[in-house]
Amino acid sequence: MIFLIGNSTSNYTVCFPIFILEDTRALKFPYSMLQALEFVLTFVSFYYVIKCCYVAIHIKSFHRNLTVLLIILMIQWFEGLLSNILIKPYETGFWPLGEHNTQLKQWWTKDYSKMIQVPNLSTFPNFFLGGFLKWHYILSMITTLLVMSIERSFACYFLTDYEKKSRNGLFFMLVVGQTSTNLVMGYLFFFNAAHFAVGFSIILSTNIIAMGIFTYVKHVNRQVNRAIEDFSNPSLYCLPARFQVRENVRCFQMITKVIHAGLFLILTACFVNLFMYLELTPGLDPLLNLIFESAINLNPVVIVPTLLGSVNAWRNFTFSSGVCLGFKAQVRLKIIKVSSVSIGNDGAKSDRTRKETDAYFDQLNSAWI
């Protein structure tokens, strides 16, 4: 949706990744039930995000860099949640956007007469802040595959010692690079500095590059794994390399399934967006708009179960089992401490006995002499 900010003499445009505003039907029955459903699914998404972070922290299945990248990806959902909270009142017409009191429906236009006019960004700061946060969140989701592909390429290159080292420099390079890139792209998209075709090309090329890196690294890892299994390259046959290759295999399986789930969400969003754009079923716009927004804001409902189900160590994990594991770990630690104390006491007793024995034989030797 394109907004014209300013007046006839001084103005600029702002682009929003939304399609409908002030659709008051969303607050009336039966479409109000959809808002209740979205509210419930938001809590479900919150549960899955917390669970994914908890599992990734407590069950070490991947290198620390990849684990932290996954956690950052999950935490960024709260950015999308905040943007949805800021935009939703205007989207449903609960709060009017200035003098507009009718449904606003638009996707992209270069015609100034069709743009939604707003005098200033400061007039509705919450609304426009939510739009920028939403752009940043969408771009963060899009560039995650590229960042993970680069991280796995380093894991494949430093095969023999990647797991032994923290690689903090690589981690900060990836995080800072992704964050700065998303901020710049979000600024350009929000202020409509990049044409729609240019922005779409950037997003598409980013994913094509990521898929190319992912496919190449997966192929190289498969060759290394075959060489290790066949003992054809003795220099590669070491435990760290074997361990890293297997970790890469698990990671590729996980990313492949997540990509399929992500493509399902993207295609669903594009399909319903096309329906709304062509106005094929205008009476179902609240339902279609909810599906479109859910594909963006409620993606953990699909992504997280797919992610957890693709890793054997994560598949059957529950919070209750995690609490039990933590309790068992504490009990085991106490047993080890008690054993260490008892061993220390036994050692002290044995030292005292040895000293007494040595003193006894020294006295016996002196008396014998």
Swiss-Prot record:
Locations listed in the record: Membrane
Membrane spanning residue stretches: 1-21, 39-59, 67-87, 127-147, 169-191, 195-217, 258-278, 291-311
Protein family per UniProt: Belongs to the nematode receptor-like protein sre family.
Species, as recorded: Caenorhabditis elegans
Protein name: Serpentine receptor class epsilon-45
GO process annotations (BP): sensory perception of chemical stimulus
Cellular component annotations (GO), alphabetically ordered: membrane
Gene label: sre-45
Signal peptide: none
Membrane protein topology class: Multi-pass membrane protein
Keywords assigned by UniProt, alphabetized: Membrane, Transmembrane, Transmembrane helix
InterPro entries reported in the protein's UniProt record: 7TM_GPCR_serpentine_rcpt_Sre
